[in-house]
């Protein structure tokens, strides 16, 4: 009887998929090559890139909600939505004299599950079957002791093999009794007590990739358990499952519905390795981020199913129009700190050697930030974190790109001469530029502003080197940079206003962000006439206060809690964690 009921559920899910307007792969092919389910927080700048499968097609948009406009030159819907709610608008594609229209669903809410990509640690690369209560607690301790949480690293996630050999007699999922002798509730409570989020792993099949029990057919009983354990993120793999895209959608939708019914607010992280193009349907299936490739390995060039950094660039470079707030393309785990000591991360890269070079680790990190990919560290927490690696993890101005409230993935600008150039729009109006030298020798890169739609060749820009955290000379029309082999340079550009200082005042003594008598106090001496963008968020990225000001002292009332305060001015962003 249960089997028949489950089949009925699957059929109903398939019908719901059709009603959502997500056509199966073989019927009603879309004329669009971009997201049609998009999200924003109220009062935060929004951007939706509109792209057609035929790049020469004419595009237009109608029915936009208040606060949004259509920028035909850049082919983006942009603006600031003011009120929460569900809205729709139409995209019209005209080619060869024929026009087709497609609906966009636009959800505006201050309670989105994943407004900015998560930053944390995932157990698989270094730990695999050894994941345990002690290791999870050790990671939480390490992140707080080294002040990594101040930079945004605030999630500890268990991958495969946390499971007992079998479920309880009543079907409930159980953790391994030796490695988690007290169950998972105390583990979750410990992580939460450190001001961090707790994540777990499952599979949309009967068995996980490592052979533990999966969630297929038991979605609700598992979701209820995750709610009891206060799990914030569930990574859901797709091993041992049918290959069809329609089936994947149905199975992930079943898990998303179960998580919603369980009531804790657990976020679904889809992991089917990009084989069924989840960026085209993951949001409709209830996912908030999705892997776009096979597992990343600790090497520059991968082999077989192993992704090196070159393969990550290949897989991410053409899907930026499918990303935005609450819907992120995930480039997989970061290898910073591994140095060839990982387990699966060293496979398919020859199984030998020291891993990547420090320039290559920095390149991987910079690109993940330009792409606003979720960032899951994967080093062994039981080993000493090298100073160079810790410096990467505390590169606050680079991280600010990843955590930008508009959630945009950088667009590919050029791959000429083995120099891979990306450009990224930021919420405060700045534009970030990166160049990765994939050749074997040093090169000079030239950014041509006429190729970057967010820049104006007639305007002058304040330029900041984000790795060096230094202001450079102003730029107009072009920007040149020397780039070592396999290195990545990252710059942030802000339009220069007449009479405004070029040097960022956030670098000088006197700047401070602190809690005082129940108020947040931001002191910015020497910034008269300079425009500052201030965003106050909780640790998950929900915007609690937002303002643009030319004032030098700002006070805000906030309830008790942990917050990140991001202050942007003259191409520099400073993040401060405060406890009220």
Label for each model-derived stretch:
Residues 504-580:
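C-terminal outer-membrane/trafficking sorting elements
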Residues 76-84:
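Extracellular/luminal low-complexity segments enriched in Ser/Thr/Pro
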Residues 475-499:
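C-terminal beta-strand-rich structural cap/linker in extracellular carbohydrate-active enzymes
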Residues 60-76, 472, 541-544:
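Low-complexity "stalk/linker" and mucin-like segments enriched in Ser/Thr/Pro/Ala/Gly
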Residues 125, 137-139, 143-245:
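Aromatic-lined carbohydrate-binding/catalytic grooves of carbohydrate-active enzymes
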Residues 218, 267-376:
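Glycan-recognition surfaces
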Residues 30-57:
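Solvent-exposed, low-complexity, repeat-rich "mucin-like" stalks and linkers
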Residues 362, 368-371, 376-378, 414-455, ...:
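Carbohydrate-binding surface patches
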